[in-house]
Amino acid sequence: MKEGIHPNYEVVAVTCSCGNKFETRSTLGNVLSIDVCNLCHPFYTGKQKVLDTGGRVQKFADRFGMFGTKK
């Protein structure tokens, strides 16, 4: 490998929009701002919204179900 062509891999202070702060390593610089972290992401907090598409499918089948059946 050539010397001097690779970016520096340094410790970076990461700040989330929820206020959580932690350190990691990156080549991006020394400060990084993120929108979502493990403390505020819906998947990790258990506040996920489950989309109910069953109602839409049933509504479609009620309106247009007769077109898909063979006689």
Curated annotation (Swiss-Prot):
NCBIfam families: L31, PRK00019.1, PRK00528.1. GO terms for biological process: translation. Its cofactor is Zn(2+). The keyword Zinc applies. The gene is rpmE. Keywords: Metal-binding, Ribonucleoprotein, Ribosomal protein, RNA-binding, rRNA-binding, Zinc. GO terms for molecular function: metal ion binding; rRNA binding; structural constituent of ribosome. Binds the 23S rRNA. It comes from Pseudomonas putida (strain GB-1). It comes from the Bacteria. This is Large ribosomal subunit protein bL31. Binds 1 zinc ion per subunit. Zn(2+) binds at residues 16, 18, 37, 40. The keyword Oxidoreductase does not apply. PROSITE patterns: RIBOSOMAL_L31. One of its GO terms (cellular component) is ribonucleoprotein complex. Part of the 50S ribosomal subunit. Belongs to the bacterial ribosomal protein bL31 family. Type A subfamily.
